[in-house]
Structures are given as C-alpha cells and as structure tokens.
A protein has these predicted regions:
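Hydrophobic alpha-helical membrane-insertion signals
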Residues: 1-26
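Anion-binding and metal-coordination hotspots
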Residues: 3, 55, 60, 66, ...
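Helical catalytic core of nucleic-acid polymerases
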Residues: 36-40, 51, 87-94, 102-103
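Basic, short loop/linker segments at the boundary and entry of helix-turn-helix/winged-helix-like folds
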Residues: 18-67
Length: 535
C-alpha cells in the first residue's frame, strides 16, 4: 500500500526552481514510504477511539508536511500553518488541504508523541541504507536548552525542612505520650494522620468544635492536636514536593514540573549572570553527520546520561556502537566499565585529559598488573585505610610511596599537598579504573584516536550549531518530559532530513569528516621535567 503519494493534482505556476524542488519532495516522500513509518501512522489511525465525525486530513501527508517544515523552517505550529497556505512546496505536500494549528498540535500529540523513537529510527535506518553510511564511529554530547517555564516560579526540594519538621513532630508525639508510635525513620503523612486520628478518638476531641482566635482557651489535648494538624499540612506539602522532584534532582518549576533549575551555557560563557533557568539536558548520538539517537534528561551534568543513551541506541538498532568518542564529561569509572562489558572501543576522554595534554597536571602514577609505580620508579605499598586516610571510593585502594625527599618530581607530585617536606605520600587509586584510563589514553593518542577526536568536534559540535544557530532553536516550546522529547525528536529528524535533501543531487551523503594522513604518527604527551632541589 502506498501511504506517501501525491494523488490530488493542484494548479501551481510552473517554473524551473519549482520543478527541482518538487522532484526533491517526491524523493523525500519515497524515503518516507520505504522507511515503513506509514505502518506506524496507519496503526495509530485505526486504533484511535476519538476519530469519529467527518473525514479528517490525510495523516500521511500531514506527517510529511510537519517533518519538512521542521527541516526547512522555524517550525512553530502557527508557522507550519502559515507555510501550508503560502509556501508552494508545503502546499504541494498537503495537496492544497490547509490544516490549522490546533489540527497540527493534535496530530503531533496523538500520532508522534507515543511512537517518537520508532518513527525516528525507522527513517534513520532508511537513510543509512540508501547512502550506505558507516556508523561504526559514534559521538555523544549534550547541551542545555531553556524550557518553556516561568523562571521565577521555581521550587527547591525541601529536604532540610522535612528533616526539621520530622524532629518537631517527634517532640510533639513525646509530649502526647505517643513515643512508641514511631521509629527512627522519617514519619510518613499517612502514618502520622492515623496517629492523630487515634489520639482524637482516645481523648474525645471533637475536631469541628475546636475554637480559633484570641481569647479562646483550649485544653492541652486540643492544643496538641491543633499543632499536630498544622504539622500534618506541612508534611503533606513537603512529601508532594519531594515526590515531584524525585531522587535525582533538587528543584522543579510550577509551570513545567519536569523542568529543572540549571545554569545555561549562554550565562556561563558570557559571564554576565549565573542565575538559574528552567532547562532540559538534551543528549544526541551522532555518526556520519546523522543524528542516530537523542535523549531528554533532567541531569545537570553528563555523567549519568552516557549509559541511558547507549541503552536507547541498542534498543532501537539492536547493536552497540563499535567505537565511541566523547568529551571528558563522560569519562568516569562507571561508564568505562560499561564500555568494556559491551565491547565498545573506548575513545572517551578522562577527567584529567586537558591537564595531561598541556603538561600542567601530568600523569603521576602508572598502574601495572602487580601494583602502582610513581614517576621516580618507586613501587607503591598497599596499606590499610586509617583515621587520617578515609576511604572515598568503594573500590579504592590506599598506596604509600616512600623516598620523596630526594625525588626530582616532588615539585609536581606534592604541589597540592600541605606537608611537602615529608619523605612519603599517600594516594588512593582504583587500580581497575587506572587500567581503563590507560587503555583510553592509548586509544586517543593513536592515529585512529586523533582522527576520531577531530571528527567528534566537527560532527557533534556542528550538529548543535545547526540546531541552535542555523535553525534558530534556542528555547523549547512544549511542556512535560514526553512532549519535550517529541519536540527534540522532530528537531533532530529535521536536521537529518535537511542533510538528506541537500545530498539528493549528488547521490552521496555530504560528509565533512577528516581523514587521517598515511604518515601520521602517534601523539605523545609532554614529559615531566625533573627539578633538582636546592641544597
């Protein structure tokens, strides 16, 4: 069955440019037809219980028009409606039928939002198939985009207030001789409400006849209940706020409860303000200049977004990336272990990459199978943790290095220590993490690693440049995590379709990647210079 086809002829003044653009649109419609996205739309169409009444718009052409507008224009709903009236290319796609903005909004909510990942990946797979793209090298990066929320209507997670209120409630229960009704854990509003009800029943307190205002004398039991009820109202409020925030964030906004308070990059780099704004953390996975996967997160950093992004990629492409290169924001032990477990070749920079590359913070310790060695070729002695050297990491091991007084590298090794004159130093390391960092270091410094690092800057940063600058997308228009995710999907799909349309003439996907010269040698970090101590 042909889903995406122009069936209704419309009168358009012919011109050479129109013919070229219409040919591109026909190829774009063929791409959608071959991708299988029509089956998804058909499934939604015939399972929609609200499709009563007169016949609606052609959903396939409506979908094609929305995707085309996101690729070519600043695609707000009213802008798409405007293009359906005045732009010949969009008018050609919708066959002269002009939907209004509410129809477009309902279509996005009913057809695209529930099946956004399926729609996104099936179109991408068809582009990869047509141009025979190599997607073995993948790059992940993120950016923060401002949410559509009132920046003054923010709420902080009331953790401290909740703890203080819990102490007050327990003190009140002690006054009421109910100390056996609670444990050391935080009292829930449900249990506290039951305690108050039982207290009223045992003391014959009529809740409706407790007088308010000055000059009204109350019994001790009535005073206790009145104060306890005030605490109950506050407790319910705090629990509701903590439930909205969840475990992984400390704030939300009243006008968009899924948005989180963040410092945006514009504020950070301009140095004009460090005020918090409502925002979302947008992550994309790019390969061969094609956005293969996207994700919308509430995390303020990129540390914990790496694994969910790769899991999404595996879920919809049935494989993990062969090689992956990311910046130092993703370089932690948990992510390195994940890459080893799933056979992903590690080109992810670690936290001290820039320090080692510049020579300001060089590598001071080297790990081998039997232990750790320092720059002065002293082997570290594994010692137990004590009162002065507390364990900071679950897998950490404490090492002691002796012979520091005659070491010519101590000016670097002890630069950040208070006691620089001692003949020893302690360091806590994770041996397995150090081995994984060494593997990443060797991969990144190899000729293949140099090529991947340069292409990471070209592809991933160029993608964000397309979205933010060329497509003028710097603020999210929808509210709620699911709808925001669908909007980001449409923007990412718009970037891919834009590149697809520009590559149709050449029959080759435009690729600005940098290739390694044949005589390129391995990069070497600067060595640490020895500095003799003054006698």
């Amino acid at each position: 069955m042909n889903y995406f086809s122009i069936k209704r002829p419309i009168f358009i003044v012919p011109s050479e440019k129109c013919s070229v653009e219409f040919e591109k649109i026909d190829k774009f419609m063929i791409l959608l037809e071959k991708s299988g996205v029509g089956k998804i739309i058909e499934y939604v169409k015939y399972n929609d219980k609200n499709c009563k009444g007169r016949r609606g718009y052609n959903p396939y052409n409506l979908f094609a028009a929305i995707i085309y507008c996101f690729a070519k224009f600043n695609a707000t709903l009213r802008d798409i409606e405007d293009k359906c009236i005045f732009d010949l290319r969009v008018l050609y796609i919708v066959e002269g039928c002009i939907p209004d903005h509410s129809t477009l909004g309902n279509f996005i909510n009913n057809y695209i939002v529930p099946y956004q990942y399926e729609i996104f990946t099936c179109i991408n797979k068809q582009i990869i198939k047509e141009f025979n793209l190599d997607i073995s090298n993948c790059y992940v990066d993120g950016t923060k985009i401002e949410a559509n929320a009132n920046k003054y209507k923010f709420v902080w997670k009331p953790t401290k207030f909740h703890n203080k209120l819990d102490i007050k409630i327990k003190d009140l229960l002690n006054e009421m001789d109910l100390e056996k009704t609670y444990t050391n854990d935080l009292i829930s509003s449900y249990n506290y409400n039951l305690i108050l009800k039982k207290y009223c029943f045992d003391n014959n307190i009529d809740v409706n006849n407790i007088s308010n205002g000055r000059g009204k004398k109350l019994a001790k039991e009535q005073k206790n209940y009145k104060k306890g009820y005030e605490y109950l109202i506050k407790l319910v409020e705090y629990e509701e706020k903590e439930k909205i925030c969840g475990e992984n964030r400390n704030s939300y906004f009243k006008t968009d409860k899924d948005a989180t308070a963040m410092v945006l990059k514009e504020d950070y780099y301009s140095k004009l303000s460090h005020d918090f704004h409502a925002g979302y953390n947008i992550q994309v996975l790019v390969s061969s200049l094609l956005i293969l996967m996207y994700g919308v997160f509430q995390d303020r950093t990129d540390f914990n977004t790496f694994i969910p992004m790769n899991n999404l990629y595996y879920k919809y492409y049935n494989k993990y990336p062969k090689n992956e290169c990311d910046d130092a924001g993703y370089g932690n032990y948990k992510n390195y272990k994940y890459m080893r477990e799933h056979s992903i070749k590690n080109y992810v920079k670690f936290q001290n990459w820039e320090g080692e590359a510049s020579g300001k913070n060089p590598q001071l310790f080297y790990t081998f199978n039997d232990g750790v060695i320092c720059l002065n070729t002293n082997i570290g002695e594994q010692v137990p943790f004590d009162y002065y050297h507390r364990k900071r990491n679950k897998d950490g091991v404490l090492y002691k290095f002796n012979g520091c007084s005659d070491c010519n590298y101590s000016y670097k090794c002890k630069a950040k220590l208070k006691n620089k004159d001692e003949d020893y130093r302690y360091i806590e390391l994770i041996p397995d993490y150090e081995l994984l960092k060494e593997e990443a270091r060797n991969n990144l410094l190899s000729p293949k690693g140099i090529e991947i690092r340069i292409n990471r800057s070209i592809q991933i940063e160029g993608t964000f440049g397309q979205i933010k600058n060329n497509m003028n997308y710097d603020r999210i228009r929808r509210r709620g995590l699911e709808k925001v995710s669908a909007e980001i999907m449409l923007m990412c799909l718009g970037v891919n379709i834009r590149r697809y349309l520009s590559s149709i003439d050449e029959n080759k996907f435009k690729n600005n990647c940098w290739n390694t010269p044949e005589n390129l040698s391995k990069e070497i970090f600067p060595y640490v210079k020895q500095k003799k101590k003054k006698v």
